[in-house]
Amino acid sequence: MLTHLDSQGRANMVDVTDKAVTSREAVAEAFVRMLPTTLQMIVSGGHPKGDVFAVARIAGIQAAKKTSDLIPLCHPLMLTSIKVHLAAEGDDAVRITASCKLAGQTGVEMEALTAASVAALTIYDMCKAVDRGMVIESVRLLEKLGGKSGHFIADQAQVSS
């Protein structure tokens, strides 16, 4: 069942008024593939625009907080934790993981996915002058905890909470 559609098939925001406040958490990831020389420039701190990872981290945090402004049917949430981690993966990629938490009536999957996506876009923006062939890939939800639908772990069967 698509929860964002009413009985006539019109888009609407889900009413969470009567849902219990519970602890909720989500973790998402994204990868940015690039030339090895581009990754080396980022890791060594040699980028003329500054610390690429620091800027991407802040962009991801800001994006999580702005998710409801970007995705029309997302509820505005009072997130209590946002963490964005960036690390070199092999010699040609950056792996981004983003986690979001709150005590609330709806999940934080979209906030975590938005954080990872915007951090990846920020890396692309900062490095496009030296590597226009970068690829943002594998944006996905890794884990979701809390709420009625239970515990989800990517690549595993759904686990109830």
Swiss-Prot record:
It comes from the Bacteria. SUPFAM superfamilies: Molybdenum cofactor biosynthesis protein C, MoaC. The active site is at D125. One of its GO terms (biological process) is Mo-molybdopterin cofactor biosynthetic process. Pathway: Cofactor biosynthesis; molybdopterin biosynthesis. Transmembrane segments: none annotated. Substrate binds at L73, C74, H75, M110, E111. It is an enzyme of class 4 (lyase). One of its GO terms (molecular function) is cyclic pyranopterin monophosphate synthase activity. Its EC number is 4.6.1.17. Keywords: Lyase, Molybdenum cofactor biosynthesis. Pfam families: MoaC. It catalyses: (8S)-3',8-cyclo-7,8-dihydroguanosine 5'-triphosphate = cyclic pyranopterin phosphate + diphosphate. NCBIfam families: moaC, PRK09364.1. Homohexamer; trimer of dimers. HAMAP family: MoaC_B. Belongs to the MoaC family. Catalyzes the conversion of (8S)-3',8-cyclo-7,8-dihydroguanosine 5'-triphosphate to cyclic pyranopterin monophosphate (cPMP). This is Cyclic pyranopterin monophosphate synthase. The gene is moaC.
